Amino acid sequence: MMDIKFGKMELLHSYQKHGYNKSKILAALQSGIKDIVQGKQNHTLIYTMDLTTIIIDENHNFLTAYKTSKYQYKVKKIKGLNGGK
């Protein structure tokens, strides 16, 4: 599993906006990593097997997490491969 540093404000934002607390995020990571894609501004998008997207920065600091649909996953993966365009 990746070593992700969780900040209190980022976890609070993730929970308030998307309903993901630290235990849900860790459970999503436990389900397995489906794909890792480079996003904009040196952010890394981690897609898990249960279609949760976890975004971290270049220093492995947690930024946010949210649920992704299969369609969003395909579109974002293609955008990630094209440098976010």
Residue ranges and their predicted role:
Residues 1-85:
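Ribonuclease/tRNase effector modules and their secretory precursors
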